[in-house]
Amino acid sequence: MLLASPRHTVHDLEHWKRLEIADSMRARHPGLAHKEDAAIQRLRSFASGGNFFVSASWGKDSVVVAHLAWRSGWRRMHWFPAGFIENPDCHLVRDAFLARFEMDYSEIEAADPVVGDWGHDGAQRAFERASAKMGGRYASGVRAEESATRKRRMVVFGHETENTCAAIGWWSTDDVFAYLHKHDLPIHPAYACTRGGTIDRNRIRVGTIGGQGGTGWGRREWERTYYPAELRAIYARMPSLVQR
């Protein structure tokens, strides 16, 4: 269920309807059901090792993992929004999901979000500190297909380590969108912001605005098109970013 947004153009929505046809076909494939069952078993296995929480970002992958956890009987969930650089539409996904699925939910906003040329954009350090206080064990939507770093993580560690669970680590992006369609789960509006299909939705990330990572596919231009007011507000607080 794509969440409506005034950011969407007519051409964006026309393209999204075409994508939904493919999502619907993949959602009916028996292979997806097998992947769902396996992911639920991984989460239950991880739970047998001790308390943990689902790490939310409200992007497509974390919504899938949150729903799989809910189906497995697990309810503990936390979000660590990145303060003033957080994508503002993540709250729409949060509200739509929690209105339908009862979770033991909390969130801690980062007081010192980072926008730099190194590491993660956003609130990675705040996440690490807060997750340690919560016991340090968590399940996330990390997938090998997203980056070379995450692929290495899956190759080296597999789906589960002592403190982390990547239940959908080997799912494709097509699998993720098919699952969202199959279970009518809320989908972040940004994934339909494709300039009428000229941008691959699989490249779009929804975590933060104004960051320096992942700009190779045209992230800055995309943000200027769809989040201009938010970008101006960030530049006003951090003028050094304007020239980057």
Regions picked out by a protein language model, each given a short descriptive name:
Residues 1-244:
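Nucleotide-activated chemistry modules centered on ATP-dependent adenylation/adenylyltransferase
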